[in-house]
Amino acid sequence: MRIVAARRCRGAWARGYRSRVPVSESLLRSALAPGGTLAAVPDDFSALGAHYSGKVRENYTRGDERLIIVTDRISAFDVVLGTIPFKGQVLNALARHWFEATASLLPNHLRSVPDPQAMRVSECRPIPVEFVVRGYLTGVSDTSIWRAYERGEREFCGHPLPAGLRKHERLPSNLLTPSTKAPKGQHDLSVSKAWLVEQGLISAAQLDELERRCLALFAAGQAMAAERGLILVDTKYELGQLPTGEIVLIDEIHTPDSSRYWFA
């Protein structure tokens, strides 16, 4: 990627990051690829902390906080397909909106948004489980609730499913259907709550409380989506634990990358 004025950008970014002063315009625009998208960040940004690169996000950890830069990359089924101009800014804005709107339902890791394409968050120990909530009998992957139902299975992640449901039909109630976070190159597995407890990944009491809170988050998301002519079909929540032991929502919430939406 061709970097333009990356060193000047780094200095301004670092000052804004250290002083925690919001930045009025995107400093990352100086790192755009010729096509107008942010596919990577300058090497100079490594001064912001230990670096980890995800499929879409660049992470810099320093002490008890993390700087997350949301790139314009788009991925599906663990493959980066390309970039979409300003996708990162849209994802970041949506995540911020939902974090702030739902903090009373489940605390989250957000500290501030120093740039349209980045956020400062509290460093957490991730819980190795994806908390997937589903409201409809749908999906395209082999591990989806619809594929299981199509194969004749009438129980999914410990939830009994009635006979006679059709594809894309609304489920009798919203369901928490956890999945494992498989190593890179492997598929996640949909599992039951009992399995998570048996594996020692989380206690039964914690899981019951988190199920209640995740379902509340999803219901709030569905209500707000309905007001705008949309259906929140299903979504994925990721959770982490602070050094204090408190469990908080991390990563993102109700974005198009983590959720399925339909037009109502």
Locate predicted features.
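Short hydrophobic transmembrane-like helices used for membrane targeting/insertion
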Residues: 1-4, 21
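Short, positively charged and aromatic/hydrophobic N-terminal segments
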Residues: 17-19
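Active-site loop/lid in soluble adenylation, ligation, and acyl-transfer enzymes
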Residues: 22-182
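ATP-dependent phospho-/nucleotidyl transfer catalytic cores
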Residues: 120-122, 138-231, 242, 259-264
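Catalytic activation segment of kinase domains across protein kinase-like and atypical kinase folds
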Residues: 238-264
